[in-house]
Design a protein with these regions (language model features):
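Iron-associated oxidoreductase/ferritin-like identity signal
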Residues: 1-208
Length: 208
């Protein structure tokens, strides 16, 4: 007679027997928050796109925090990590807003990688000018989409989403752009096209 699994083994066995989602991704749960379903649906879709890009930007900062080198190592090492913490707060706020509106927030790395508009960085270490250019490019994408999303949320009277985008996402990213750009004001940035052109190209297939 075989022994019945106990503890963690039992939990795994039960999970295998009942693998189901009680709230599928893309499905909206209605909540009594005095907003039309169509407005909630649009905000959820937009915020999930922004969530993917904010997670990617946060992780890009962490990569550069670990890999930065050169005479400005100490200052940038600390600055990048401070920005990681601030972006992490935005990630949490955006994801929770998605859930509040009745949606399902993106969470897993493969889903984020499939969704983000920010180009994937190489695995290896880059010089500081390339790191800075890559960060400013990512910020430009986030800011461009956040401004459009904020206007759309305001048009739908989704004041909570609009406030998050303006007071949280836009202001935080603007401030980080200032700190990063001014920190290396005398250092030439490395990029093949202007940041604005690159951001426009990345956003060209994203329809709001």
């Amino acid at each position: 007679m075989s022994e019945r699994p106990t503890g963690a083994d039992a939990m795994v066995s039960r999970a295998k027997l009942r693998p189901r989602e009680f709230h599928p991704y893309g499905h909206l749960v209605r909540r009594p928050i005095a907003l039309p379903e169509s407005v909630c649906k649009e905000s959820v879709e937009n915020l999930n796109q922004l969530l993917a890009d904010t997670i990617t930007l946060r992780d890009l900062y962490k990569k550069h925090h670990w890999q930065v080198a050169g005479p400005t190592f100490h200052q940038l090492h600390l600055l990048f990590d401070r920005h990681v913490d601030q972006q992490s707060e935005l990630v949490d706020a955006i994801a929770e807003r998605v859930q509040l509106l009745g949606g399902v927030s993106l969470a897993m790395a493969p889903d984020v990688a499939e969704t983000t508009l920010i180009p994937r960085a190489p695995r290896g270490r880059e010089e500081v000018p390339a790191q800075i250019a890559r960060l400013l490019f990512a910020h430009e994408i986030v800011l461009k989409e956040a401004r459009v999303m904020a206007r759309r949320a305001a048009d739908g009277a989704d004041d909570g989403t609009n406030d998050l985008l303006v007071s949280g996402v836009i202001r935080t990213n603007e401030l980080q752009v200032w700190f990063v750009a001014e920190h290396v004001v005398d250092m030439p940035l490395v990029h093949e096209e202007s940041l604005e052109q690159a951001a426009d190209r990345a956003l060209s297939n994203f329809k709001l």
